[in-house]
Amino acid sequence: MAEAQKTVRTLTGRVVSDKMDKTITVLIERRVKHPIYGKYVKRSTKLHAHDETNQCKIGDKVSIRETRPQSKTKSWALVEVVERAVEV
């Protein structure tokens, strides 16, 4: 019996911290409809992701995927940098 291919979760967000070695903090924003009033409100989540080459900088838009736990709080890995932040 063949194993079914498990779909890998991928998310896109913005890097808000790159101070840790080989780790970035990514802010994921989503819009959720309020259950009573019906207005769409922004909700956000911060996730730690593994950045093996330390290539990300603050403000970059990145794509991350779920992976095995790397540490207590880190279970996501960097897939690609979608858009670089503007240098000031």
Swiss-Prot record:
Assembly mode: Part of the 30S ribosomal subunit.
Gene: rpsQ
Protein's name according to its UniProt entry: Small ribosomal subunit protein uS17
SUPFAM superfamilies membership: Nucleic acid-binding proteins
Described purpose of this protein according to its UniProt entry: One of the primary rRNA binding proteins, it binds specifically to the 5'-end of 16S ribosomal RNA.
One Pfam family from the record: Ribosomal_S17
Example of a GO biological process term: translation
GO cellular component: cytosolic small ribosomal subunit
Family: Belongs to the universal ribosomal protein uS17 family.
Cited HAMAP family: Ribosomal_uS17_B (MF_01345_B)
Example of a GO MF term: rRNA binding
Organism of origin: Stutzerimonas stutzeri (strain A1501)
Keyword annotations: Ribonucleoprotein, Ribosomal protein, RNA-binding, rRNA-binding
